[in-house]
């Protein structure tokens, strides 16, 4: 069973609430932890020790010059999902930092986008039992058409 930290305790405490209310509460709370996430109006759809799913709508403030989600917004949701799944697993005394981000833009996006970040049981165990380390966090970013307009690789580190 995963070790609980403050972030995972918040998720567990709200897990019995109706999904719409839970999503809203997570988004507001996490937007206070990382203000840029709140400003971008990112919504947390699923949060667990093994997976975080976030969504960003194609709204005016996040659009590029052709009316699609800006490249930075695409990278932001990948970084947000991978960062929060990492944060669900590291001890409270650790700092979580992104070490590198690689984003390949494959085609224009269509509509809202969803990022799904996942960790293996081995990655979770490593994060929960070591004071410092790093790992590549898997993430898939999809648009409304069901396609992946970007491919991302996020390397996260934690240290005490």
Where are these regions (language model features)?
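HotDog/MaoC-like acyl-thioester-processing domains
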Residues: 2-18, 109-110, 120-160
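Hydrophobic beta-strand-centered segment that forms part of the acyl-chain substrate-binding groove
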Residues: 84-120
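Hot-dog-fold acyl-thioester-processing enzymes
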Residues: 57-82
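Soluble, non-transmembrane catalytic domains of enzymes that act on hydrophobic metabolites at membranes
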Residues: 39-46, 51-57, 69, 138, ...
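Hydrophobic alpha-helical segments of small multi-pass membrane proteins
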Residues: 72, 76, 80, 100-104, ...
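Hydrophobic residues positioned within well-ordered beta-strands of beta-sheet architectures
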Residues: 54, 99-101, 115, 135-137, ...
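Non-catalytic linker/capping segments at the edges of enzyme domains
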Residues: 1-53
């Amino acid at each position: 069973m995963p070790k609980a930290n403050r972030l995972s305790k918040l998720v567990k405490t709200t897990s019995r609430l109706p999904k719409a209310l839970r999503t809203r509460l997570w988004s507001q709370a996490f937007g206070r932890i990382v203000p840029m996430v709140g400003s971008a109006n990112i919504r947390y759809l699923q949060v667990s020790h093994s997976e975080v799913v976030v969504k960003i709508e194609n709204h005016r403030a996040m659009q590029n010059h052709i009316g699609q989600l800006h490249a930075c917004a695409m990278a932001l949701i990948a970084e947000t999902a991978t960062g929060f799944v990492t944060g669900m697993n590291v001890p409270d005394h650790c700092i979580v930092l992104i070490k590198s981000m690689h984003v390949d833009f494959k085609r224009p996006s269509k509509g809202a986008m969803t990022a799904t970040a996942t960790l293996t049981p081995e990655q979770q165990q490593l994060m929960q039992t070591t004071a410092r380390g790093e790992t590549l966090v898997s993430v898939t970013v999809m648009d409304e058409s069901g396609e992946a307009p970007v491919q991302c690789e996020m390397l996260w580190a934690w240290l005490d």
